[in-house]
Amino acid sequence: MEDVDLYMQSLGVPARRNVNDPQVIRGEQNFYKAKCHLCHVTTLHTKPRGSVLLNGTRLPWLGSQTIHPYSDFLLHDMGSEIMGVGLNDNYVSGLARGNEWRTTPLWGIG
């Protein structure tokens, strides 16, 4: 099972599509206008080559990479309610409580 886990976590991300399409360009402009980029960070840099570990296994090919995930991969405390809408679903997933949401990566959407 560890091999499957390693494989799944090492898969490449989908390529961005239709980057010159006017509708995609408008969507990107709206993304910044709505300040989505404050949580959905466009560009991140991985740790130096040779320092990326997964379950104690070095993954040198994942180091020194520039990625465009449109996420910060963090858990955010969304509170129990925002503007009168209850966001706490009481669903525990891993270490995340029901009021914590991970910023979903938007890579490959275009």
Language model features with spans:
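Electron-transfer interface patches adjacent to heme c in soluble/periplasmic c-type cytochromes
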Residues: M1-G110
